[in-house]
Each structure stands twice: as structure tokens, then as C-alpha cells.
Amino acid sequence: MQILDGVLVSQAIKDELKIKVAQLVTEGKKVPHLAAVLVGSEGASETYVSAKVKACSEIGFKSTLTRLEATISEHKLLAVIEELNTDPEIDGILVQLPLPKHISDARVIDAINPAKDVDGFHPENAGRMVQGLPTFLPATPHGIML
């Protein structure tokens, strides 16, 4: 049995992505831009989103973190997501779960444009994953499968 060194694998992936981002810039193409949405200030969610923003910075991606109060209405959160869906500068959207109890995770996930759903949670992307078709894969299960 071989033991996987997660730190080394992570660094190798980051190094590869840095090269790809540099190639995009050299070719005059747009640098990928992740929009992360954090509702409330739950500790584990803060840590996870901060790690994503840091990872973006390390590889040369742009990132935008939108922090919203835990009391935001579902309607207002859906409006924020729609703005991100239609913003041509945003390539990927991550809404950190869990959401406050008064907001439906399912409605929020459904509102994310499947082409910008970096978690792969949108029903269209989940269906493509089950069928073995190209799609975004949720990071943790994908990492385990590697």
C-alpha cells in the first residue's frame, strides 16, 4: 500500500494550475474568476471559504467573496446569485453550505447557473456526474476518487 502525501499532491496541482493561468495571460485570455458567497459567520464555513479564496490567490485566479448577514432573506440571496450568474466577469460560483434554516439550500443550488456551479451540486450537473458525462465534480469526492 502506498501512502499519499496530500501536501505534495496539493502543491503539484497548484503548480500545474499556476502554469495554466500564466498561459492564459500570455495568450491574452481572461483570468478565471471565482465568486464565493458566505451567508452568516459560522466558523467552519469561514475557514473553508477563506481557504478557497487563498487557493485562488496562490494560483493566480481572481476571487470575490460576498459576505451576507445570516438574516438575509432568501429572495435577496437569490437576487445576489442572479447578479453573479449574469456577470460575464464571473466564471464560477460557490455558495457555502449550510445556509441558515430560513433559506432553502435546494432553491439556492437550483438558482446557480449550471455552467458556473463549481461545486457540481446543481441537478443538471449532478445528473451529468451520475451519467459519467463531463461536468464539475464536487471537490471532496473527486479528491477521494483520484
Residue locations for each model-derived region?
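Short, well-structured alpha-helical segments in soluble
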Residues: 76-88
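Short beta-strand elements in bilobed, periplasmic/extracellular small-molecule ligand-binding domains
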Residues: 56-71
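Short beta-strand segments enriched in small/hydrophobic residues
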Residues: 31-40
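Anion-binding alpha/beta catalytic cores of soluble intermediary-metabolism enzymes, centered on
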Residues: 95-146
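Glycine-rich loop at the start of a catalytic domain that most often binds anionic cofactors/ligands
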Residues: 46-53, 79-81, 106-109
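Positively charged, low-complexity intrinsically disordered leader regions
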Residues: 1-28
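Non-catalytic terminal and connector segments of soluble metabolic enzymes
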Residues: 58-60, 83-86, 112-115
